[in-house]
A protein has these predicted regions:
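Helix-turn-helix
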Residues: 1-4, 8-46
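Hydrophobic/aromatic residues within well-ordered alpha-helical segments
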Residues: 44, 51, 55, 79, ...
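Amphipathic alpha-helical linker/stalk segments
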Residues: 46-74
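C-terminal peripheral helix-coil segments that are non-catalytic and often amphipathic
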Residues: 104-112, 136-170
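Short alpha-helical scaffolding segments that buttress acidic/His motifs in well-ordered protein cores
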Residues: 83-87, 127, 131
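Non-catalytic, well-ordered alpha-helical scaffold segments
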Residues: 77, 81, 121-125
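Internal, conserved structured core segments that host functional sites
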Residues: 78, 84, 91-92
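Amphipathic alpha-helical packing segments from all-alpha helical-bundle domains
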Residues: 60-63, 91-122
Length: 170
């Protein structure tokens, strides 16, 4: 039941954001009584925290399992949508999310290429910012720059390539 609630909340938060989603909406999507959502997760902020951490853990599990890139990309996109919408809705994401396995994994990959911890962390932050920027503004960027017909897989590959370059010392 908790998994169904988390899945339903993640879908709704990705679609319209936590601010526009009520506990009753989540309960209806999960086909449970709204009292169960409160009993299992508490208030909406606590539910947002649970969803953020669950999405991060799920993405990490997919990566650890060697799941195919398209499936990882779908999960990553949803995680970033939930994260972005929660941030835009004013939720204190940095306080609510307690585990950042994808960011830690990226930092661990970047760290050996740098002379010190600060430059490794900054390079990782730049790469994450690029990914978040595309996540938030993809429709605008495609239109403004004239990339409406670029296939999704080509865009994703280009983003990952640029993230790799941003991660290098310069």
């Amino acid at each position: 039941m908790s998994a169904a609630i988390l899945e339903s909340a993640a879908e709704l938060f990705a679609e319209r954001g936590p601010a526009a989603t009520s506990i009753r909406d989540v309960a209806a999507r999960a086909r449970v009584n709204h009292g169960l959502v409160f009993r299992h997760f508490g208030n909406k902020e606590q539910l947002v925290a649970a969803v953020l951490n669950d999405q991060a853990a799920n993405l990490s599990k997919l990566i650890d399992a060697g799941t195919a890139l398209p499936e990882i990309a779908i999960a990553g996109t949803r995680q970033l949508r939930v994260l972005s919408r929660a941030l835009l809705d004013g939720y204190p994401v940095a306080e609510l999310q307690t585990s950042f396995p994808a960011a830690v994994r990226l930092l661990d990959e970047v760290r050996p290429q740098h002379d010190n911890e600060d430059t490794a962390r900054l390079a990782t932050a730049h790469a994450v910012a690029l990914l978040l920027g595309w996540q938030l503004f993809e429709p605008f960027i495609r239109s403004a720059i004239g990339l409406p017909d670029l296939p999704e897989d080509a865009l994703r590959q280009s983003i990952f390539t640029e993230m790799g370059r941003l991660s290098l010392p310069h």
